Amino acid sequence: MQKKYFFVTLLIFCLSFPSFVTGQDIPVIVIAPSKKPQSISTVGTSISILDENFFKNSKEIFLGDVLSRNSTSTNFFQSGGHGTSSAIQLRGMPKRYSTVYIDGVKMSDPSSVSGDFDFNNILTSQISKVEILKGNQSSIYGSGAIGGTIHIFTKQGKPGFHKDIEYVAGSHNTHNLSASLSGGNKKSNYYLGFQRFQTDGISQMTHNDEKDRYRNNGLIASYSRKFTDKIELQSNARVAETYLQYDAACVSNLFGCSPNYDHAEETDGLEGSYNISLIHKPLEKFSNKFTLANTYIKRIYASAPNSKNTKQDNYYGDRYAFLYQGNYNFNLDNSIVFGLEREDDQMGYNKDATVRINSSSHVISQYFDYQSRITNNIYATFGARFDEHSFAG
């Protein structure tokens, strides 16, 4: 195994700027910049925040549609209609340099060529907040975060008991149903949500009534419990099952392609993630967080007769991550975050009709991030990270 260390330093000085506040002057708290709660006025990097009320007012069903219209320095790409491949660029960097996290779980796809995450299956009814960090975040999140990071937080339970159901219908047999149950008290909270979206879509073929169907069944769940003032358990889970039809491209033969060629390719997808965290706070100024996380992505492509794709492709990517994070607050103006991480990836695909390719790799990382208020108007951040990859070094 190669042993080569990747080192990143980041030093930022910034003038303080007003917090985004409500009528009661409550400061906005963010988590993504340093992996711990802090006021947005102390963040030394460009950040955009989309909260739950924003998503309710937007009326968009897919997260990608929201981000494409409401975030600067963000480029959203989609290859077609609902369910087709999509990705996001931050600060003009290639999409593989913009990492995505859902409830703290890294969501890149080990089975894809560049490892970037596909946004096409994330529905807005499941989201409470999105934090978009723009610019290099490598000292905290690794070399894949040169362009920035997108942090998606799903809904959590609130005190009391709550239930919600919403149904919307439209043309082309389009239906969207979402429902949830949630609740909580002083020691624990829970949330369970389901959403189903389906549509016949709009086909580019004009000579028949062939459909480009898409279906998305999504389920999220969360549970947290505070056992004592020093020990807390947090957990999140997410599953998305999808089905997509799209127009097949006919391969020309001696007689050419029939003008009435109306076959469709099909893609079945399964995407899941979960994380379980134990938080231990032995001191008022010091806390530890231990996390086990997993993501699983599977895609099956079924070819149409006489199409350019001549076989059925089956891709899967599986990642386990073991994470430790420590936080120490020296005082109100100085704090440090440090951690150890190990990610184990497995992937597989069909090279041809008879050969199956499987591969695995791992990366071990150590990092720290120190934040300090120099004066009332200037903040400084210094961070370093070491990555050891089993293949790349």
Regions found by a protein language model. Give the residues of each.
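N-terminal periplasmic "start-of-domain" segments of outer-membrane beta-barrel proteins
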Residues: 28-58, 87
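N-terminal periplasmic accessory domains that precede
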Residues: 29-31, 63-70, 86-89, 101, ...
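Hydrophobic, lipid-facing positions within transmembrane beta-strands of outer-membrane proteins
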Residues: 86, 148, 161, 175-179, ...
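Short acidic/polar hinge/loop motifs at secondary-structure boundaries
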Residues: 106-134
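Extracellular loop and loop/strand-boundary signature of outer-membrane beta-barrel proteins
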Residues: 114, 162-166, 204-209, 252, ...
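Transmembrane beta-barrel wall of Gram-negative outer-membrane proteins
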Residues: 169-198, 207-245, 266-283, 330, ...
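Surface-exposed extracellular loop regions of Gram-negative outer-membrane beta-barrel proteins
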Residues: 187-201, 287-304, 335-343, 357-393
